[in-house]
Amino acid sequence: TAILVQDRPVLGGNASSEVRLWILGATSHMGNNNRWSREGGLVDEILIENLYRNKEGNPVILDTILLEKVYQEPNITLLLNTAVWDIEKADPQTVSKVYAFCSQNSTFYEISGRLFCDASGDGILAYRAGAAFRMGAEEKRCYNEQFAPDKGEFGELLGHSIYFYSLDTGKPCLLYT
């Protein structure tokens, strides 16, 4: 059994309708624009279903597909609009509990478990647990990565963005306001 805690109202992170970045993965690793690369597994399953059901590329439809995938898995409990804000440790090396709060229904959650994965994007669980972390992009010399940037090649942190697009589908479409 897993509990998926998401601090936003939709799943997908940067690929959600809130941010609207497309799922790239291997197809654009380090900006190489490899048109022959393709993600496999669950990502491929989601992308194929999105292509089939969402010919216009509406980001809200992708949100729905992601939500359906989670609901189809009986061993996942989903907590949307719920942010982890603190942790408890069983010992100096072991997280035993996370504390979360849902802003939509003012509910506090105390979640116990044996394994926790921080995929929040901001690393709150890892930070509260005292894990080592870094901010920004590491230079090539840090890990001897061939395609990593030299210092100063791009910004150290991601900026904010707003993204609009339009598409002539050749037929009437729903207008979201």
Tell where the protein language model's regions lie, with residue ranges.
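N-terminal Rossmann-like FAD-binding beta1-loop-alpha1 element of flavoenzymes
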Residues: T1-A2
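Flexible, active-site-proximal loop/turn residues at the rims of small-molecule/cofactor binding pockets
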Residues: R20, Q104, D122
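Glycine-rich loop(s) and the adjacent beta-strand/alpha-helix scaffold that form part
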Residues: D118-C173
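Core beta-strand elements of the Rossmann-like FAD/NAD(P) dinucleotide-binding domain
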Residues: S106-L115
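Conserved small/polar residues in nucleotide/adenosyl-binding loops
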Residues: Y176-T177
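Short beta-strand segments that buttress and anchor functional surface loops
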Residues: K97-C102
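Conserved N-terminal/central alpha/beta ligand/cofactor-binding core
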Residues: Q6-Q93, R134, Y143, L158-F164
